[in-house]
Amino acid sequence: MKIFDYEDVQLIPNKCIVKSRSECDTSVQFGPKRFKLPVVPANMQTVMNEKLAEWFAENDYFYIMHRFDEEGRIPFIKKMQDKGLFASISVGVKDKEYDFVRELAEEGLKPEYITIDIAHGHSEQVINMIRQIKSYLPETFVIAGNVGTPEGVRELENAGADATKVGIGPGRVCITKIKTGFGTGGWQLAAINHCSKAARKPMIADGGIRTHGDIAKSIRFGASMVMVGSLFAAHEESPGETVELDGKLYKEYFGSASEFQKGEHKNVEGKKMFVEHKGTLADTLTEMQQDLQSSISYAGGKDLDSLRKVDYVIVRNSIFNGDRD
């Protein structure tokens, strides 16, 4: 198995067949809906909130609402669907979550997407929760994770998951690899490639995305959707506290298993950092789309599928030519 990560790989260009990159289509069918970009903000408290979820849905972008406001999930589903927007929520695997799924069915609420969101998703608990959701809400598109192996992908798909989320601790505010010795940090792109060999359904690449080019690389190696945390953090609309340090504005960004999210120092696998203020999300999404259109034009195609067919080289950390922040 080849081991590499995002900064180790360069994609090789093909002959361009478009007059302008604006001809390139970045949209993706994911579950019951089509979205403008194969990108989803991380379902973290410092990245996503209800107001942003509404904005993303209105503008044809995929989102996943985090699971840290358990009481607010049913009102959120009702509000989104009353507005004619899709509902995409997260659940855990504790006993009360089984009751929650049952309650949704009893109330006739059918969120279009449910993500089962735990750090180590290759587990009987996740498999049982997939079956619970599919039993009570058979039409809901179920995303399950996180996993880092082909065996994990295969087992969750076989249990009924419609998509899997791949990545164990490669994110900027995740310290799983340091705290536990396990994870896909440092070889996340190779893990996506490895898992894609077993996947029969869509995969979400989750974590380790540092540049827009990494989105194209994720798709090349098998992802249908790419989850982004730090690149979406610290915008004007982002949740999180704004602070001024040395005359510059920053926003806090912390991991979902950090003590800042948990409110206690127990089983901590996340940390907190401050990210420089970046302007508006709309501007970032526009730039992301334009960069991905350029990627497609370099791939010699007109849509995302062309990215899957390009060749690549492994260059071992040299793509920055020593010029790194």
UniProtKB/Swiss-Prot annotation:
Q: What class of enzyme is it?
A: oxidoreductase
Catalytic activity line of the entry: IMP + NH4(+) + NADP(+) = GMP + NADPH + 2 H(+)
Among CDD domains, the record links this protein to: IMPDH (cd00381)
Membrane-crossing residue ranges in chain numbering: none
Q: State any GO CC term.
A: cytosol
Q: Report the SMART domains cross-referenced here.
A: IMPDH
| Keyword match Transmembrane helix | no
Q: Where is the active site?
A: C174
Q: Listed GO molecular functions?
A: GMP reductase activity
Listed GO biological process terms? purine nucleotide metabolic process
User: What does this chain do?
Assistant: Catalyzes the irreversible NADPH-dependent deamination of GMP to IMP. It functions in the conversion of nucleobase, nucleoside and nucleotide derivatives of G to A nucleotides, and in maintaining the intracellular balance of A and G nucleotides.
Q: What is this protein called?
A: GMP reductase
Source organism of this protein record: Staphylococcus carnosus (strain TM300)
Q: Gene that codes for this? A: guaC
